[in-house]
């Protein structure tokens, strides 16, 4: 039924929250701001790292030191983005099986494109060919705009009709809608199932290998 899968990264393929939270907490401590818990940080993930930092400090982007704070946060995260990050249980088995079935795959994330490429090379080298991160400076709007998904489909030589989008959040559901793709939401990510059930989706899956039943 589908020959292409577009994956979100954080909360879908990789459990990155501990490393993201550590970088947020580093910046908060360095500048004397209240320090958020991991669960508090988790609620703010999904719209890219800049918006995450906006939500994590007093005054957000209106803070006169915001650019410096964001630069320090980004540098710290880039250096420590793989300390505790890991693929969710069953993800590598799923990706390998999809590869075996000649399913085309891409990662589309609002995370900085350098971090996305780095994590793709560490965890999915030789398995996933296309990985796109936030690059609005190049005129490509971040999710939930359809731009990144359309770019990924173009690179893969795929069509919307034969492609499915897999993610774990409100942003992912809306991205799929905007891109004209069916959406599969995963319950092991950064949003609880009761939140996911209020969104637009084709199916919610609880284990990675359940995706195989959907794409057949």
Q: Which stretches of residues belong to each language-model region?
A:
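Substrate-recognition "cap/lid" segment bordering the active-site pocket of phosphatases
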Residues: 83-84, 113-164, 170-179, 193
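N-terminal helical cap/lid subdomain that shapes the substrate entry/recognition surface
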Residues: 2-93, 100-101, 114
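Short, glycine/polar-rich helix-capping loops at beta-to-alpha or helix-loop-helix junctions
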Residues: 189-198
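Short secondary-structure boundary segments
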Residues: 110, 135, 187-189, 208
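Phosphate- and divalent-cation-binding pockets in alpha/beta enzyme and binding domains
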Residues: 23, 52, 90, 115-118, ...
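Short acidic-hydrophobic, aromatic-tinged amphipathic segments that line or gate anion-handling sites
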Residues: 203-207
């Amino acid at each position: 039924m589908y020959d292409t899968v577009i994956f979100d990264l954080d909360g879908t393929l990789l459990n990155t929250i501990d490393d993201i939270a550590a970088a947020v907490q580093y910046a908060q401590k360095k500048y004397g701001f209240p320090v958020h818990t991991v669960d508090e940080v988790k609620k703010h993930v999904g719209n890219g790292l800049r918006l995450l930092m906006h939500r994590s400090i007093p005054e957000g982007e209106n803070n006169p030191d915001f650019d410096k704070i964001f630069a320090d946060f980004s540098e710290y995260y880039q250096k420590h983005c793989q300390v505790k990050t890991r693929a969710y249980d069953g993800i590598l088995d799923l990706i390998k099986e999809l590869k075996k079935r000649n399913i085309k795959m891409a990662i589309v994330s609002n995370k900085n494109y350098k971090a996305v490429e780095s994590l793709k090379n560490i965890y999915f080298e030789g398995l996933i060919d296309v990985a796109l991160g936030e690059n609005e400076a190049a005129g490509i709007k971040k999710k939930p705009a359809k731009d990144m998904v359309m770019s990924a489909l173009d690179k893969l030589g795929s069509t919307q009709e034969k492609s499915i989008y897999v993610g774990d959040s409100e942003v992912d559901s809306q991205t799929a809608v905007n891109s004209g793709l069916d959406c599969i939401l995963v319950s092991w990510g950064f949003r609880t199932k009761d939140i996911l059930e209020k969104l637009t989706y084709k199916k919610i899956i609880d284990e990675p290998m359940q995706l195989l039943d959907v794409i057949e």
